[in-house]
C-alpha cells in the first residue's frame, strides 16, 4: 500500500500501514535556525549519499522495519554534526556507519605500519551473539578530501589484526578509522566503533589529478565499492 489519493498519503512505519493527511506548504519565511538545520541535514545527507547501498544493509539494525539509509541520516545529524564558523563538519568519533546489536570489540586501535599501510588491531574476546567467524568491516574517512569515505569487508574477528593498504587519495590531513563486525550466522551487524586516526600532515591542496587517477585504479583492483570514486569526483 503506497501512493496518494487526494489529500491523503499512504505511509508505512515499522511494517504498519496507515493513511495521513498531506502536509500543507508553509508560506512563512523560515527562521535562521530552521535554515541552519536544513543545511546541516543536507550536509549529512550529501556525506552519506554515496554510501546508500552500504547503509541500507549495515544500518538496518538501528530500528526494526526502518530504512538503513533513512536511519543513518538523522542519527549522524543528531550525534556527529558539528557547526563551524564557515559551515559544518563531522565528528568521526561519534559518527556511525554500521548499527546493530552484534557485540563489537572491547578495544580497537590503528597505527601506521608504513607510508602505504595501516595496521588495525582489536580485542578478540567473544560474548553473547559474537562469534570468532564474524567478518570485519573497516571504514576510512578523509575529511581533507571532501569527506571521502571508503569501506570494505575483510578479515574476521578471530584475526585480531588486519593490514589495510591506504587508498592513494586518502593520505592527506587526518585519516579516521572505524571498524564493525558482521555475523555469518544471522547477518547481524555491530555498531561501528572508532579505532583512531592517522595525521599525515599534508593539506588537501597536495592532492592532484594523479592521485585521483590512482584512486580509480585502486578501486577497480581492490573491489572497494563505488563510494570512494564517487566522493573523489565530488571535489
Predicted regions and their residues:
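Long, polar/Ser/Thr-enriched low-complexity segments
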Residues: 1-105, 225, 229-235
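Charged linear interaction tracts used for macromolecular binding and regulation
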Residues: 65-232
Amino acid at each position: 500500500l503506497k501512493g496518494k489519493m487526494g489529500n491523503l498519503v499512504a505511509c508505512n512505519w515499522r511494517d504498519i500501514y496507515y493513511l495521513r493527511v498531506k502536509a500543507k506548504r508553509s508560506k512563512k519565511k523560515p527562521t535562521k535556525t530552521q535554515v541552519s538545520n536544513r543545511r546541516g541535514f543536507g550536509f549529512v545527507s550529501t556525506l552519506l549519499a554515496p554510501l546508500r547501498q552500504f547503509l541500507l544493509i549495515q544500518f538496518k539494525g538501528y530500528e526494526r522495519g526502518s530504512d538503513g539509509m533513512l536511519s543513518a541520516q538523522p542519527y549522524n545529524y543528531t550525534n556527529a554534526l558539528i557547526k563551524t564558523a564557515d559551515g559544518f563538519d563531522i565528528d568521526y568519533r561519534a559518527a556511525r556507519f554500521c548499527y546493530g546489536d552484534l557485540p563489537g570489540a572491547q578495544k580497537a586501535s590503528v597505527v601506521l605500519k608504513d607510508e602505504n599501510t595501516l595496521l588495525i588491531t582489536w580485542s578478540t574476546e567473544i560474548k553473547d551473539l559474537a562469534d570468532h567467524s564474524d567478518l570485519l568491516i573497516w571504514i576510512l574517512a578523509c575529511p581533507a578530501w571532501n569527506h571521502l569515505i571508503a569501506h570494505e569487508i575483510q578479515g574476521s574477528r578471530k584475526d585480531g589484526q588486519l593490514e589495510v593498504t591506504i587508498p592513494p587519495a586518502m593520505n592527506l590531513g587526518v585519516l579516521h578509522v572505524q571498524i564493525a563486525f558482521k555475523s555469518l550466522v544471522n547477518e547481524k551487524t555491530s555498531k561501528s566503533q572508532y579505532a583512531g586516526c592517522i595525521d599525515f600532515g599534508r593539506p588537501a591542496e597536495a592532492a592532484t589529478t594523479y592521485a585521483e587517477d590512482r584512486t580509480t585504479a585502486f578501486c577497480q583492483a581492490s573491489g572497494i565499492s563505488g563510494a570512494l570514486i564517487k566522493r573523489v569526483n565530488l571535489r
